[in-house]
From Swiss-Prot:
Pfam families: Trypsin. Residues 1-222 form the Peptidase S1 domain. Its main location: secreted. Monomer. This is Protein C activator. It comes from Agkistrodon contortrix contortrix. Its EC number is 3.4.21.-. Glycans are attached at N21, N78, N129. Gene3D superfamilies: Trypsin-like serine proteases.
Amino acid sequence: VIGGDECNINEHRFLALVYANGSLCGGTLINQEWVLTARHCDRGNMRIYLGMHNLKVLNKDALRRFPKEKYFCLNTRNDTIWDKDIMLIRLNRPVRNSAHIAPLSLPSNPPSVGSVCRIMGWGTITSPNATLPDVPHCANINILDYAVCQAAYKGLAATTLCAGILEGGKDTCKGDSGGPLICNGQFQGILSVGGNPCAQPRKPGIYTKVFDYTDWIQSIISGNTDATCPP
């Protein structure tokens, strides 16, 4: 996260660190057994850490889990990287709520343009040269009009959100992918992609719109693994 500060240790109990083949992503615990992240974070040797804050000094309740099952949406459009960038992971063992671990529920309404949203992650705090922090950084950004992202990026999928600061300076960045966008306390987005370098004016982040996938997510969690994704 660019332009943010160290997150409060108590504000990200649902935040997962997804580490796979040397690449870093975020994720969100949505109940005791399931984590949501971005599809493009899917690599081999995936490990999922919960209850983390300082990567050098582990919390006593920090846990490591592995994916037992992974669910994706099959693409219906031409395969742009922004389309259906969502992955639902079943953990190999459930986790219990503890001092630094608790799930974040799915949204009951979609966000509106102008909403203030929290971003967070262990991604780089400088760009284009990367500086990876030991602690997650957090910042506040806004849901922007979709036209801003359409002007900045070609081939956007309809099931995405556009969020950032119009004049730049605050943004998610490399290593934050898959992490949550939390607007008015609701889990609304999964970081998909953004500008390179990060935090440039009029180059906001693209987030998978969680609200559009709630039926799919709930179907899979309840055992209907043939559930279809939104178009």
